Design a protein with these regions (language model features):
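Conserved G/P- and acidic residue-centered "switch" motifs that form tight phosphate/ATP-binding loops
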Residues: 44, 98
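Rhodanese-like catalytic fold shared by cysteine-dependent sulfurtransferases
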Residues: 1-40, 48-90, 101-149
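Short, surface-exposed ligand- or partner-binding patches at beta-edge/loop junctions that are enriched
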Residues: 93-94
Length: 149
């Protein structure tokens, strides 16, 4: 698929899911857009503890949406985003499973990022039948680049 076809599919998903922002991407689609769309950024909105103990995506912009400990909203989220990401470029948000990144995409839209996207499944994906993550969906299970520690 071309970048335009991927973004059209993401927009169609957003319409089906009644999402107000640019679209919803699978991890594989997000990686393709990030690699090939001029200026595209992947923003990881997990906590510092998650980056440190679960893993990083090399080259991703890291801005906590909620701070750890306590899961309090990061009052500087939008200003940090504006400092690091061009409002005209595609910006994709990823978290553990897709919930916080949805909220980040909403905040970005409100801040003037018209092409903001949520990465479905997130970094770790959903839990499997045994209650474990990283086996069903997600960035890691898709075999996309990440490092630990």
């Amino acid at each position: 698929m071309t970048i335009n076809e991927i973004l059209q599919a993401a927009r169609k998903r957003a319409e089906q899911m009644n999402l107000p922002y640019g679209g919803a991407l699978t991890p594989q689609e997000a990686a393709e857009v990030w690699r090939n769309a001029p200026g595209a950024k992947l923003v990881d909105v997990r906590t510092r503890a998650e980056w440190d103990y679960v893993g990083h995506i090399p080259g991703a912009v890291e801005i906590e949406l909620l701070t750890y400990p306590g899961n309090r909203p990061n009052s500087a989220f939008v200003s940090e985003l504006e400092r690091q990401v061009d409002k005209q470029a595609p910006v994709m948000f990823i978290c553990r499973s897709g919930a916080r990144s949805h909220n980040a995409a909403l905040l970005a839209l409100q801040a003037g990022y018209a092409t903001s996207y949520n990465v479905l499944e997130g970094f770790e994906g959903d839990r499997d039948a045994s209650g474990h993550r990283n086996t069903v969906g997600g960035w890691r299970a898709a075999g996309l680049p990440w490092t630990q520690g």
